[in-house]
């Protein structure tokens, strides 16, 4: 590839909130530049998983190389990386943005700027991108392009006077977007003669090719037959083939600086290829790694158990397969007295958890129970050591604990001002501290510090329901803070049920315990003896409900007569119940677990 060709490359990504038309715009760009024939076009070409299409979200970063003949007569190569828009995948977004020089900021002309647009745009600005604002859906009757332009200038501080108004659905003005990419975004820098240095953008498992790695070449050349080394994980592999996506896989002889493409080789484990890692040549390595690489850290943990114990091995195999494709998902085996064998899994966030669970159920036909999600707590022991607690059931003895620290987040919430009151109340209820409140037109932007523990449960759902779906929410984990946290156990018939124990803040323990007991009272069927259901902190019972016994009317056969006759029969029944209670076992049905773990307060 000659130097002249390098100046004709443009690498860009599309930044947008969920549902603002990012994937549809990508479809149009592919169609106009002739990347796929009419027959091969499906809606949302780049969202390859069914779940991605159904939920209308992009989970894995995808890439496509388009060739475009511009108005100046030259042919340009455009590399688009389609990034996820959701906060759980913020790290993937960051790495995708690091692989390109510019972004299209797509904003829905009827909705305006949302919280995740903000989060991703700030990441693009941090990566020194040139940004071209694009207003989508201008053909809608509710579109207010001028108002949204003003909003982009107020909230983000970008000059939106030359924003392009388009409709990705009908294809209106999309050709202007292509021209803007060529004229307003810079070509990539890079030295062809330098040692190979490439950014690993993403990787996934392909049944035929093994692990496919998506790379952006910074310096040097990547050819087949080379021996490459991942600097972060230290793995060394031989390259079998290199190529690009147009979105179909097309093999190439080599990839030069500034190009984005894929490589396959003797790589067996996706876990060896970490997003954000630097790839270099084994014999002639580059001097230093690209900045910003950090292995994905799971944030939310929960137990996944098969409803039918016979499916345990299938679940293990399915998790192994998913792990091939998604290295940010981690799991280890665990057993629970109530639920049998299963796995303790770590996720990037709640959406990630839902998606993994849904993929396990859908792609592998498994029935699963998920225990209540929890976060990682740091426990400072009295002997000076610090341990990480993933599962509330494993909490050490209270006497040995100096303090418990929990993760806190900095949340940014954008909401129409009529819902502001309810949003503030929700954050206060969740032990939040308000940091700032600013107005952007008719919308309020609130920044709160909140404990992650309060957010993983159902914060997002509550936020959406109190704001009729208009509020949007984004967060970063900031620090660990000491908190007054206690372990709440649930006892059924005086036996602790491990799957239902949780760490809660002392101030909220009473309410949580009461809700849990009331719930279980309705869910556990009656037995022939009384069943107490208790919530306890240590030895102190904080809430109790009793499931009354089923009993036979033993005095029915006595007509009139002496009271002592009835008394004798009743006492005999009482003795039997007492004995039964001593030896009786309470079976908790699976539905009870599932419902009790869905805490809709």
From Swiss-Prot:
Record keywords: Cell inner membrane, Cell membrane, GTP-binding, Hydrolase, Membrane, Nucleotide-binding, Protein biosynthesis
Protein's name according to its UniProt entry: Elongation factor 4
Membrane topology term: Peripheral membrane protein
One Pfam family per UniProt: GTP_EFTU
Catalytic activity as recorded in UniProt: GTP + H2O = GDP + phosphate + H(+)
Biological function: Required for accurate and efficient protein synthesis under certain stress conditions. May act as a fidelity factor of the translation reaction, by catalyzing a one-codon backward translocation of tRNAs on improperly translocated ribosomes. Back-translocation proceeds from a post-translocation (POST) complex to a pre-translocation (PRE) complex, thus giving elongation factor G a second chance to translocate the tRNAs correctly. Binds to ribosomes in a GTP-dependent manner.
Gene Ontology CC annotations of this record: plasma membrane
EC nos: 3.6.5.n1
Cited NCBIfam families: lepA, small_GTP
Gene: lepA
Principal cellular location given in the protein's record: membrane
Listed HAMAP family: LepA (MF_00071)
GO MF terms held by the record: GTP binding; GTPase activity; guanosine tetraphosphate binding; ribosome binding; translation elongation factor activity
Localization in the cell: Cell inner membrane
Chain positions recorded as GTP binding sites: 19-24, 136-139
GO biological process: positive regulation of translation
Family: Belongs to the TRAFAC class translation factor GTPase superfamily. Classic translation factor GTPase family. LepA subfamily.
Organism: Xanthobacter autotrophicus (strain ATCC BAA-1158 / Py2)
Domain tr-type G: 7-189
The keyword Membrane belongs to this UniProt entry's keyword annotation: yes
């Amino acid at each position: 590839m000659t130097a002249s060709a390098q100046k004709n490359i443009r690498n860009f990504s599309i930044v947008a909130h969920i549902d603002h038309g990012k994937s549809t715009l990508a479809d149009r760009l592919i169609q106009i530049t002739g990347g796929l024939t009419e027959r091969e076009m499906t809606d949302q070409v780049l969202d390859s998983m069914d779940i991605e299409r159904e939920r209308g979200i992009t989970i894995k970063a995808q890439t496509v190389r388009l060739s475009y003949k511009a108005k100046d007569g030259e042919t340009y190569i455009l590399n688009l990386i389609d990034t996820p828009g959701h906060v759980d995948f913020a790290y993937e977004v960051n790495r995708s943005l690091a692989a390109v020089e510019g972004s299209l900021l797509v904003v829905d002309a009827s909705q305006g700027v949302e919280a995740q647009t903000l989060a991703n745009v700030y990441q693009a600005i941090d990566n020194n991108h040139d940004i071209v604002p694009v207003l989508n859906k201008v053909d809608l009757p509710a579109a207010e392009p001028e108002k949204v332009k003003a909003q982009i200038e107020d909230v983000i501080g970008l000059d939106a006077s030359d924003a392009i108004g388009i409709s990705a659905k009908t294809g209106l003005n999309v050709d202007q977007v292509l021209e803007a990419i060529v004229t307003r975004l810079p070509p990539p820098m890079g030295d062809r003669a330098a040692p190979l240095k490439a950014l690993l953008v993403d990787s996934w498992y392909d049944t035929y090719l093994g692990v496919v790695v998506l790379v952006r070449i910074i310096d040097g050349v990547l050819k087949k037959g080379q021996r490459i080394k991942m600097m972060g994980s230290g793995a060394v592999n031989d390259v079998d083939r290199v190529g690009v996506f147009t979105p179909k896989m097309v093999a190439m002889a080599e990839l030069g600086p500034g190009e984005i493409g894929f490589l396959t080789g003797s790589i067996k484990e996706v876990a060896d290829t970490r997003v954000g890692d630097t790839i270099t040549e084994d014999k002639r390595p580059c001097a230093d790694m690209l900045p910003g690489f950090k292995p994905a850290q799971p944030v939310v943990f929960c137990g996944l158990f098969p409803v039918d114990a016979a499916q345990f091995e299938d679940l293990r195999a399915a998790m192994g397969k998913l792990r091939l494709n998604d290295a940010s998902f981690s799991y280890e085996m665990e057993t629970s007295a109530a639920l049998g064998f299963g796995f303790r899994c770590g996720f990037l966030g709640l959406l990630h958890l839902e998606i993994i669970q849904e993929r396990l159920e859908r792609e592998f036909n498994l029935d699963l129970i998920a225990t209540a999600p929890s976060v990682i707590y740091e426990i400072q022991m009295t002997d000076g050591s610090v341990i990480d607690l993933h599962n509330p059931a494993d909490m050490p003895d209270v006497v040995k604990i100096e303090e418990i620290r929990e993760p806190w987040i900095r949340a940014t919430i954008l909401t129409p001002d009529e819902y502001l009151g309810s949003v503030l109340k929700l954050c206060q209820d969740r032990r939040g501290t308000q940091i700032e409140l600013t107005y952007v037109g008719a919308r309020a932007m609130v920044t709160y510090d909140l404990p992650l523990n309060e957010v993983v449960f159902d914060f997002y759902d509550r936020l959406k329901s109190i704001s009729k779906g208009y509020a949007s929410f984004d967060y970063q984990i900031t620090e660990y803070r000491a908190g007054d946290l206690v372990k709440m156990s649930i006892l059924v018939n005086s036996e602790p049920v491990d799957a239902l124990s949780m760490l809660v803040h002392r101030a909220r323990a009473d309410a949580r315990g009461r809700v849990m007991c009331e719930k279980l009272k309705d869910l556990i069927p009656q037995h022939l003896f009384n069943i107490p259901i208790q919530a306890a902190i240590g030895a102190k019972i904080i809430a109790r409900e009793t499931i009354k016994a089923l009993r036979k009317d033993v005095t029915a056969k006595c007509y009139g007569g002496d009271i002592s006759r009835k008394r004798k029969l009743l006492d005999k029944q009482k003795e039997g119940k007492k004995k039964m209670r001593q030896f009786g076992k309470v079976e908790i049905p699976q539905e009870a677990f599932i419902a009790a773990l869905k805490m809709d307060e």
